[in-house]
Structures are given as C-alpha cells and as structure tokens.
Amino acid sequence: MNLEELKKRQEKIRNFSIIAHIDHGKSTLADRILEKTETVSSREMQAQLLDSMDLERERGITIKLNAIELNYTAKDGETYIFHLIDTPGHVDFTYEVSRSLAACEGAILVVDAAQGIEAQTLANVYLALDNDLEIMPVINKIDLPAADPERVRTEIEDVIGLDASEAVLASAKAGIGIEEILEQIVEKVPAPTGDVTAPLKALIFDSVYDAYRGVILQVRVMDGVVKPGDKIQLMSNGKTFDVTEVGIFTPKAVGRDFLATGDVGYIAASIKTVQDTRVGDTVTLATNPAAEPLHGYKQMNPMVFAGLYPIESNKYNDLREALEKLQLNDASLQFEPETSQALGFGFRCGFLGLLHMDVIQERLEREFNIDLIMTAPSVIYKVNLTDGESMDVSNPSEFPDPTKIATIEEPYVKAQIMVPQEFVGAVMELAQRKRGDFVTMDYIDDNRVNVIYQIPLAEIVFDFFDKLKSSTRGYASFDYELSEYRPSKLVKMDILLNGDKVDALSFIVHKDFAYERGKLIVDKLKKIIPRQQFEVPIQAAIGHKIVARTDIKALRKNVLAKCYGGDVSRKRKLLEKQKAGKKRMKSIGSVEVPQEAFLSVLSMDEE
C-alpha cells in the first residue's frame, strides 16, 4: 500500500472499548456487535465469545483483554474498520483497563437500565476521561420489567456529568439498538491521529504466551508501520527481537503483511518470557527508534501476599511449574519459594488484589489439579526500626523483634461504596469495625448514596467484601484504590501449641483488637485439634506476653478400674504413676495440627 492509501485507510479506523460494571451486559453487547458486523458466523457464535477462559465464563467476568477487528458498512455506504478492545471491569485489573483504554479513541459506557451507575463503572469512566476518550452512554437491558431509562439518564448526567440526551436505549440480549450504537461509533469516535511516516511507536496492552511462537504481543500502533522482518526494541528495557509475524484477531489470529498507524493487532517475535514484555510498554524499531516512549507506563506491584502450599508435599514441583505457566500470561503474578515448619515447602505469592488471588488459586486447582492450602493474606507493611533503618515486610514470620521496631506503617485505601439509602447505617458500622475513617458521603439520587472511607488494606483483604455484601443484601458496589501509608499500632501475634510457635498461624493485628482476635483463634483451635494423650495448652502471644490461653484436656485411661475398694495409698500410687507418664509424654510429644485448623483460622469470622 502506498502512503495515500494508508492515510485513507487510517481515516476509516475506529478504536473503541466497552466500559461497564460486572453484569451490566458488556460481553453480551460485544457478542451482538460481532454478530451484526458478521465477524463471526452464527455457527461459531457462543455466548461471551471474547471471554475465552472457562473461569471467565463461569464467574461472568472478563479477566484477560481481547482485541478484535471488525468491518462495518455504515449507512453512508463506506466500510469502516472497527477495533473492539474488551476490558476487564474489576478493580484488581484497573491498570490493565487503563492500558486498554489508552489504545482507544472512544468508549461505550454501558449502564444497566434497572440498576443505574455502580462504583466500578464510575472508576472506569474516570480512567476513560483521563485518556481523553469520546464517551458514548448506552442504557442497556431496557426490556427488563424494572427498567427505568429516564432515571438512569439523569443519573449519568448528574453523577458523571456526561450529556446523556443522545444515549442509545438498547437491549443487547434482544438485539435492540445495536445498529444505532454502530452508527454512533462511526459518527462520534474520532479516527486515530498518528503519523504513518514517523518512527514506530506501538503500545503493548496485553501479551499472551504461545508454546510455538513465544510471547505474542497485543499492540495498538500509534505511529509508523511494523512488518515481519523488522527488528523491534522494547523501550522500558532496551531488549531487541526479530519480528516473525504480525496480524489481527477476528477472534482467531489472522496473519497480515503489516500493521500501520491506528491498527490494533499482534506481533510475534519469538520473545521467551512475559517478564520482558510489560503491559503499557512501547515497542519501536531498533533501526529507527522513537525519541521517547508513550507516557503512562508503570510497573505493576502486587498489593496482597499469601503463602501457597500443596496439600501433598510431593506436588511441590508441579506447583512451581503451574505458577511459572500462569506467570507466562500474567506478569503481575509474583512468587518466590518459602518453607514453613508447619506446612512444608511452598511459595509466597504476590497478587494485585483479592479477585486476582482467587482467580489464580482457582486456576491452579482447576487447570493443574493441585490441592492447595493458602495462608492468611497479608499486605506490605513499612517497618521503621530503632536504628533508623526501614524495611518492607509482607510476611508475618519475617517481622523483626518487637524491641527493635520504632513504628509500623500500613497501607490505607480510599474505598468508595455505593449503596441504597436504607443500608447506609450497616455500611458505616462495618467500615468503623474495620478501623475505617469516614471521609464524605453524597446522594446520587433519592435512594442511592456514595460513601467514601479510608480503610486499612489489611482489613479489606480479610473478608470485607463478603461482609459488605451480606450486610447490604448484595446491593452495595465497591471500588478501592491505594491512597497512602499511615503509622498504626500494629503487633505480630503468634500462636503457640504446647509451647511451640506454629509459624503458618502468625498474623499481624491492630493492638486494640489483639485480645479478641487471639481469644477467638485459640477457642477455634481448641474445637478442631483432636485431644492427645497429654494436656495441650494453646496460647496466643504478642512477643513474650501471652494474651489468651485455653487447654485441650488429656485423654486418660481409668487406672483405678481394677482397684475394688482397697487402700487409698494404692490408688494414689497408680494415679501418680499415670501423671508422671503423661508428663514425660508431654515433654517429648508433638501435636499434629490437622489441615482444617489452618483453614479455619484463615476464615476467621467474628462470630
């Protein structure tokens, strides 16, 4: 293609993504658009086509990004090239969303006609506004009996400040309004601006590992052209690779001769590991590099850590291989080997957030058939020592001696909770119980309230989400972002069995709650650990101070059974003998801790 044709083609390109809260109908809308533009034959069509992972379909969420090229012949008779970039809607994957939005010029905002705006919709709209996207509101599910499009329209205008007078009323399920949406994309989404003649700049917004071709980059070309045979360079680490293939997805990968400015597609360059290709990085040509990378790239750091241990210790190597395979597709997953006296060999893993942790755990169990134990999730604490040093600690067992600690800081998040008015009291009570500080509260409409709190991340990691859902009958929606580190009165609590620390049960807790948490755990363990031949004390300790204790009584044989009547000194002798035996047993005996004990402590409910 010559320059003229490339420029003409560029004017016909429309790059857009779909933003929505979970369950507002994003994947269904994407399916309808694919059908309408006849990208996918009806034979290949299946619900949630873009969500290719089983887990995504089951949970009804989008985890990995997908980008698809469609051709659409508009009413003006011209054929346009659409690139639909699917985004995950969940808070853990916010960075992925922001990168995929950076690859677009426009976004379709899908809002449920019955439920209205939710917390995550809002978070993603702000990301889209940060990237200067043209936002087109679509009010979906208008065929529901509870639908109230007019209320939702005013909500969009009041809460987000978008003009919703031209919002399309649609039902993706019934196929209503799809054509209007496609026409709006043609009219409203600007064509990509970018210079075909400039040095290559392409934004990586996802990468997928392929066993035969190595890592395949999903890119949006901002400037320039890339074709097979070019030598590309990654700007964050300067590594170079030879391009073996470029192409587009029409869900299936289709090879092309080149990718030019405005195109969204893939580059294969026999790259060995996903670690080299960070989402948000810029690809350029090694022979004619761009002067500076695209802005907005940042290293993703895990926020939540937990130990993963195989239940059968001989599965340790399988677990390592499984984690390495998952890491090929998920550069934000980090892990390193760790050992625990109680659980044996395993890995300390870092995750972006709770959903990410859940998904990884479930994929390990489902795709690789490994049964796991997970230790209590923890966050990164900044520990300032008395000698002026400071250290980051994410594992309770690595905490320094309490006498050496000057202060401990913990991460706080800004939590935004949207909830119907009648549940505001319950939400506030929950947030206070989780050590939250109230920031502000405003009414979205007559019935819904947006409450903002600063809450320690450690409290959210625990079971905040489940508690929030149950105290609001599932009506609350919730979004959080890391805000700052603050000094807190935190202590490390150890659990001792028969005087020995059980490392896997140690956790960090706020001083004010230490006593009740300790009491809860020792009582819970007492119910679970089977009785031994000797008495076993269970203690919760902070440093050397015991804050809670309970004993598991010994099982004892009735040694007096064969003394009928008889002398009291004879009985005493037998009892003393038994007592001495128990004492000896206790000094050398060890207590087996059943698997449930760990799990029960992790699912700590304040019953």
UniProtKB/Swiss-Prot annotation:
One of its GO terms (molecular function) is GTP binding. Coiled coil: none annotated. It is found in: Cell membrane. GO terms for cellular component: plasma membrane. Residues 11-193 form the tr-type G domain. GTP binds at residues 23-28, 140-143. Keywords: Cell membrane, GTP-binding, Hydrolase, Membrane, Nucleotide-binding, Protein biosynthesis. PANTHER family: TRANSLATION FACTOR GUF1 HOMOLOG, CHLOROPLASTIC, TRANSLATION FACTOR GUF1-RELATED. This is Elongation factor 4. The gene is lepA.
